[in-house]
UniProtKB/Swiss-Prot annotation:
Protein name, as recorded: Large ribosomal subunit protein bL36
Pfam families: Ribosomal_L36
Gene Ontology cellular component annotations, sorted alphabetically: cytoplasm; ribonucleoprotein complex; ribosome
HAMAP family: Ribosomal_bL36
Gene: rpmJ
One annotated GO molecular function: structural constituent of ribosome
UniProt keyword terms in alphabetical order: Ribonucleoprotein, Ribosomal protein
SUPFAM superfamilies cross-referenced by the UniProt entry: Ribosomal protein L36
Family listed: Belongs to the bacterial ribosomal protein bL36 family.
Amino acid sequence: MKVRASVKPICSKCKVVRRKGIVRIICENPKHKQKQG
């Protein structure tokens, strides 16, 4: 899980999800998981 100020989809399978006001990226590739913080 990468914590970044700006989260961007890395590949075509990355999806942007908002949970409780936190922007997350979920993907099949675990390296692409991101969280805004």
